Amino acid sequence: MIEIENIEKKLKDTVGSDNWKKLSSDFVKAKKVYVIGNGGLYFTAAHGATDCTRLIPGKLVVSFDSCGYMTSCANDHGYENLFIRWLETSGDIDIVEDCMVIGLSCSGNSKNITRALSWAKSSGYATGMISGVQSKRLEKDINEVVLNCKYFHTCEILTLILFYQLVHEAGHTCPTIIEEIKRKDSWVLGKKK
């Protein structure tokens, strides 16, 4: 059986940490949150952003989903600047004080993530990183939530669970599967609830 490193204990330890409380507080205050990640955490970012936006009215949580922009930007500016360029472009219309950038990195050292968080911090965004292990590259004044994971899959699974914890800490709930089926059935039948 696959080892998931006592994920429930890791979740409790993480949610009880001061760094998590800071990240959660910044998340709750923000009206718009950018989530960035690579590899498996790229998809975790997309999944978490989608569900946070869907489950928290009045909050926009976005991840980077444009492959065309990604290849163009990486070609023109270098992969290490990919997320900085996206934030610069998107940030032109943001009220920075209402925004947050959350970086996801299993190693804590993804150059494009740490560079983007440094740029965001210096531009006035609230920032935070969720990492599998302590970063050796992240600037010290950026809040880092360290999951202390041995495996990539544990880090990715726990990070996704933490997005649902953010939904909860923002004062909302995640519907059960049965509740969601009933809600969708009522829409199909024209009985909006």
Annotated model-derived regions:
Residues 2-6, 16-19, 139, 174, ...:
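Serine/threonine-rich low-complexity intrinsically disordered regions
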Residues 33-190:
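Glycine-rich phosphate-binding loops that contact phosphosugars or nucleotide phosphates
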